[in-house]
């Protein structure tokens, strides 16, 4: 088992990377979690992972209650949160209780939000089962729900007690989900580590064929990159914003498309848009733009969206949490892959040109 640490003073926590659930009991002991435990999962993950995970807890001497929520981004809302609260009330929990999120980004986000707000905060553990969650959303403490069609507009920063990654859960994912998760993996390479980006590009076939060694390395490198950013800027006051590369346009597309596209698919489109914006601003060369686009194409992620509604996407971007006054915030590559900067841009023609290019 691989162990990494996210160093945040009194909110520090470990990330464990394994190939099964056999060590999770030891992780609970190390975290000194002694209260009642509740596993939150969704209808998809419940079919494939919950039984094995609950058995691992049982084998380690822990009794776990389980609550299943409907799968899908459309259910990451206050109504589902209310259902979780009602279930927790019935268990008569105290503040020593622990909520454990077994699932992808939706389950992690909503479970973390419930943990942050129930009894003004109870323990929280992330057990991510998708590549997107293992590489990105489970690390860093961002939790929340969507509201009135806007993603993650209600939420908090709330760190887990630990993250437990079983890379073999990825074998149960539909190929589309696995590919969507790779978008966030590519993102980490583009923003901070060109060598890691090249590793991903070279190993796409092995990743999609669930090569265990490659998946473990990717999990380790991803978590290291994200942890290094979060340690310097836990609450997104500056540096952490670079993790939003591809997300300003991506989130807007995701909402306008009514979540018909997966988050990673929208981030893929957003990254292509960000690369083109940097090209139009003469911050990067066309070869670099094509490199990233070709990698995303190789994975099988969308790099164009036929019939994209430029005005709707543009207007939706102004609901972005990172907006500053009337200016939109973009993370753009500077000079090369592996280095980015944050820019505020209010050039409507430029932004619409970028969005329109995604439909060409």
From Swiss-Prot:
Binding residues annotated for NAD(+), in chain numbering: 105-109, 129-130, 142, 151, 169-172
A GO molecular-function descriptor: 3-dehydroquinate synthase activity
One of the GO BP terms on file: chorismate biosynthetic process
Pathway(s) where this gene product acts: Metabolic intermediate biosynthesis; chorismate biosynthesis; chorismate from D-erythrose 4-phosphate and phosphoenolpyruvate: step 2/7
InterPro entries documented for this protein: Dehydroquinate_synthase, DHQ_synth_AroB, DHQ_synth_fam, DHQS/DOIS_N, DHQS_C
Cofactor binding mode and count: Binds 1 divalent metal cation per subunit. Can use either Co(2+) or Zn(2+).
EC number of the protein: 4.2.3.4
Keyword Metal-binding: yes
Localization terms from the record: Cytoplasm
Keyword match Nucleotidyltransferase: no
CDD domains per record: DHQS
Record keywords: Amino-acid biosynthesis, Aromatic amino acid biosynthesis, Cobalt, Cytoplasm, Lyase, Metal-binding, NAD, Nucleotide-binding, Zinc
Function per UniProt: Catalyzes the conversion of 3-deoxy-D-arabino-heptulosonate 7-phosphate (DAHP) to dehydroquinate (DHQ).
Family: Belongs to the sugar phosphate cyclases superfamily. Dehydroquinate synthase family.
Name the record gives this protein: 3-dehydroquinate synthase
Native organism: Acetivibrio thermocellus (strain ATCC 27405 / DSM 1237 / JCM 9322 / NBRC 103400 / NCIMB 10682 / NRRL B-4536 / VPI 7372) (Clostridium thermocellum)
Gene coding for it: aroB
């Amino acid at each position: 088992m691989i162990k990494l640490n996210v160093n945040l003073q009194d909110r520090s926590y470990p990330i464990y990377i394994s190939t099964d659930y056999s060590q999770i009991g030891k992780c609970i002991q190390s975290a000194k979690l002694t209260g009642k435990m509740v596993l939150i999962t969704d209808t998809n993950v419940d079919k494939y992972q919950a039984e094995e995970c609950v058995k691992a807890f049982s084998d380690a001497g822990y009794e776990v209650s389980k609550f299943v929520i409907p799968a899908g981004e459309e259910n990451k809302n206050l109504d589902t949160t209310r259902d979780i609260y009602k279930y927790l009330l019935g268990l008569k929990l105290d503040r020593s209780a622990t909520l454990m999120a077994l699932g992808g980004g939706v389950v992690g986000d909503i479970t973390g939000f419930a943990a942050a707000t129930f009894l003004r905060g109870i323990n929280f553990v992330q057990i991510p089962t998708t590549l997107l969650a293992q590489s990105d959303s489970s690390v860093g403490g961002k939790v929340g729900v969507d509201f009135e069609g806007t993603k993650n507009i209600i939420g908090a920063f709330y760190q887990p007690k630990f993250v437990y990654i079983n890379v073999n859960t990825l074998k149960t994912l539909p190929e589309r989900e696995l590919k969507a998760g790779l978008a966030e993996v590519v993102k980490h390479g583009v923003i901070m580590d060109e060598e890691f980006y090249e590793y991903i590009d070279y190993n796409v076939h092995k990743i999609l064929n669930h090569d265990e060694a490659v998946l473990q390395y990717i999990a380790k490198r991803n978590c290291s990159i994200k942890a290094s950013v979060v340690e310097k800027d836990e609450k997104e006051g500056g540096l952490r914003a670079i993790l939003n590369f591809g997300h300003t346009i991506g989130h807007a597309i995701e909402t306008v498309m009514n979540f018909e596209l997966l988050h990673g698919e929208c981030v893929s489109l957003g990254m292509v848009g960000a690369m083109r914006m940097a090209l139009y601003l003469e911050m990067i060369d066309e070869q670099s733009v094509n490199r990233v686009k070709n990698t995303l194409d190789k994975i099988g992620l969308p790099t164009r969206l036929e019939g994209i509604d430029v005005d709707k996407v543009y207007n939706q971007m102004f609901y972005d949490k990172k907006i500053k006054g009337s200016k939109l915030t973009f993370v753009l590559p500077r000079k090369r892959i592996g280095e980015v900067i944050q820019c505020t841009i209010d050039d409507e023609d430029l932004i619409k040109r970028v969005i329109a290019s995604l439909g060409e």
